[in-house]
């Protein structure tokens, strides 16, 4: 369905780490498909390609042509600034949410704040997440690592207590105390 994005489909091989498929349709004829795994090791690129092919085949989605292929690794640990004189943004500025890999909206916020600061002669980039959120993400990641056989179930259980808007806020790092209480 060209109107529905699939953010995390866990109905894929979970034997090597927390693995999901992300699908973003651009139209009824174009879509972005991503195989994502939260793990301590990288798999061969063909492993990810095969996961995508299998996911598409299971849904009877036929690809006539592939326009592009990308490959990347998102760090799931805190960034360590190398030079205090440089205003780091993105992954280098700590924008990657440690428990989810989400970064896009935080990078947008950092850019807006940095642009405003530069206009006043400053170059300080705000911390993207609170110390409490970073601590909770580290606890969550430890739980996922310790229970790697059950990580998909643990991840899904985290989200089942929240409605869609609450889950989005939780994943973006802007959840309130009530959402945190539901998750814990």
Positions of predicted regions on the chain:
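Generic secondary-structure boundary/loop-capping signal
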Residues: 4-5, 58, 68-71, 93, ...
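FAD-binding beta-loop-beta segment adjacent to the flavin cofactor pocket
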Residues: 13-18, 71-89, 98, 143-163
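Flavin-binding catalytic cores
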Residues: 41-70, 84-87, 108-131
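C-terminal helical "tail/cap" subdomain of flavin- and related membrane-associated enzymes
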Residues: 112-184
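Conserved aromatic-histidine-acidic binding/catalytic patches
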Residues: 40, 44, 99-102, 143
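Predominantly flavin-linked oxidoreductase catalytic cores and closely associated redox partners
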Residues: 1-65, 75-82
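A conserved FAD-binding loop/helix module that cradles the flavin
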Residues: 92-114
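Short FAD-binding loop at a beta-strand-to-alpha-helix junction that anchors the flavin cofactor
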Residues: 23, 28-30, 83-100
């Amino acid at each position: 369905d060209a109107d529905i994005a699939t953010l995390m489909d866990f109905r894929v091989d979970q034997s090597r780490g927390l693995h999901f498929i992300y699908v973003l349709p651009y139209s009824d004829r174009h879509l972005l498909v991503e195989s994502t795994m939260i793990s301590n090791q990288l798999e061969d690129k063909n492993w990810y390609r095969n996961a995508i092919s299998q996911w598409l085949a299971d849904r009877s989605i036929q690809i006539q042509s592939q326009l592009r292929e990308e490959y990347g690794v998102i760090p799931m640990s805190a960034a360590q600034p190398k030079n205090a004189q440089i205003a780091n943004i993105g992954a280098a500025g700590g924008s990657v949410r440690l428990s989810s890999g989400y970064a896009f909206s935080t990078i947008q916020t950092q850019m807006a704040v940095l642009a405003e600061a530069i206009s006043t002669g400053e170059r300080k980039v705000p911390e993207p997440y609170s110390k409490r959120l970073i601590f909770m993400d580290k606890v969550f990641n430890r739980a996922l690592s310790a229970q790697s056989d059950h990580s998909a179930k643990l991840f899904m259980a985290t989200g089942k207590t929240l409605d869609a808007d609450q889950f989005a806020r939780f994943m973006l790092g802007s959840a309130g105390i009530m959402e945190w209480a539901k998750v814990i």
